[in-house]
C-alpha cells in the first residue's frame, strides 16, 4: 500500500496539473487568444530556443518604466536560474505624471510592486492583463481616500492610467503570460518604476521632483533598492509591506 502522505501528494499534483491544463484550454477557447497564439507561437518559440528558455515558457517577470515609456519582459525556466531579457516593448501612451497613484480618477499610472491577477480575453482594449492594484501598500498610503482600481496592461494606444502597448505586442505578451500561468506561475510579478534608475537623464528628471518632495524621495529609494538588486542578480528579492505602507526588501533565498 502507498503511504497516505504519498497518496495526498499525488492527488494534489494531479489536481494542480488539471487546473493548469483547464486554464490554457479555457483561454484558447476565446477567438482573440486562439488567433494570437497562432500568429505568435513560432516567433516566440524561436526566441525561446535562441535564449535557452524552455517552451512553453515557464516563468515571467515584467517591469515597466514610466518616464522612459518601456515595458520589459524577462523569462527563466525555474527558481534557481537567473532571468534573461526576452522582450522590450514601447509603452505607446501615458497619462498623469511621475508619482504613485493614490486616489481614484487622478489618471496616474501606479508605481510599486504588483502581480497579474486577471486575464481579460474580451477586453475593449484588444487583450488585457489586470494588476492587483491597489496592493497592501497602496491601501495604506491612500488613507481614507478611494485609491481606485482596474489597472491593466492592454492593447490599443489610449489610456487613463494603465500601461498600453501595440496590439501585436499585446498578443505576444498575453500568450506568454497565459503559458506561464498554465505552467504553474500563478503570480506573475510586475514592477512599475518611475524611471530607469541607471539612466542619467531619467535620474536628473526624478531628482528635481524628489528634491521638492521628501515623501516621494523615500518611496522612490525603496523602489530603486528593488531595481538595483534585480539588475545585479537577475533574480527577484523578497518584498514585504510594513504597517506604514513602505516596501522592505530581502535577498532572494535562491541567490
Task: List each language-model region with its residue ranges.
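Exported/periplasmic cell-wall-interacting domains
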Residues: 105-254
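Short Gly/aromatic-enriched secondary-structure transition segments
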Residues: 77-92
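Acidic helix-start/capping segments at beta-turn-to-alpha-helix junctions
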Residues: 65-68, 90-96, 190-196
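Boundary at the C-terminal end of the N-terminal hydrophobic targeting segment
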Residues: 17-21
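N-terminal post-signal-peptidase region of extra-cytosolic proteins
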Residues: 43-61, 73-76, 93-104, 109-116, ...
Amino acid at each position: 500500500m502507498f503511504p497516505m502522505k504519498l497518496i495526498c501528494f499525488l492527488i494534489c499534483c494531479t489536481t494542480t496539473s488539471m487546473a493548469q491544463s483547464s486554464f490554457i484550454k479555457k483561454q484558447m477557447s476565446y477567438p482573440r487568444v486562439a488567433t494570437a497564439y497562432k500568429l505568435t507561437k513560432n516567433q516566440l518559440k524561436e526566441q525561446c530556443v535562441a535564449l535557452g528558455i524552455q517552451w512553453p515558457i515557464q516563468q515571467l517577470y515584467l517591469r515597466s518604466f514610466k518616464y522612459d515609456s518601456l515595458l520589459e519582459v524577462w523569462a527563466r525556466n525555474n527558481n534557481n536560474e537567473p532571468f534573461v531579457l526576452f522582450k522590450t516593448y514601447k509603452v505607446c501612451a501615458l497619462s498623469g505624471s511621475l508619482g504613485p497613484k493614490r486616489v481614484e480618477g487622478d489618471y496616474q499610472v501606479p508605481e510599486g510592486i504588483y502581480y497579474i491577477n486577471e486575464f481579460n480575453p474580451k477586453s475593449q482594449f484588444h487583450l488585457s492583463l489586470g494588476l492587483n492594484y491597489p496592493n497592501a501598500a497602496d491601501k495604506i498610503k491612500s488613507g481614507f481616500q478611494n485609491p481606485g482600481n482596474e489597472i491593466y496592461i492592454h492593447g490599443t494606444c489610449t489610456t487613463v492610467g494603465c500601461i498600453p502597448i501595440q496590439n501585436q505586442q499585446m498578443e505576444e505578451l498575453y500568450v506568454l503570460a497565459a503559458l506561464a500561468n498554465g505552467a504553474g506561475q500563478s503570480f506573475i510579478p510586475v514592477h512599475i518604476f518611475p524611471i530607469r534608475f541607471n539612466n542619467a537623464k531619467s535620474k536628473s528628471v526624478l531628482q528635481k521632483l524628489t528634491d521638492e518632495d521628501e515623501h516621494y524621495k523615500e518611496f522612490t529609494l525603496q523602489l530603486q533598492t528593488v531595481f538595483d538588486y534585480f539588475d545585479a542578480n537577475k533574480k527577484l528579492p523578497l518584498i514585504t509591506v510594513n504597517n506604514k505602507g513602505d516596501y522592505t526588501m530581502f535577498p532572494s533565498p535562491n541567490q
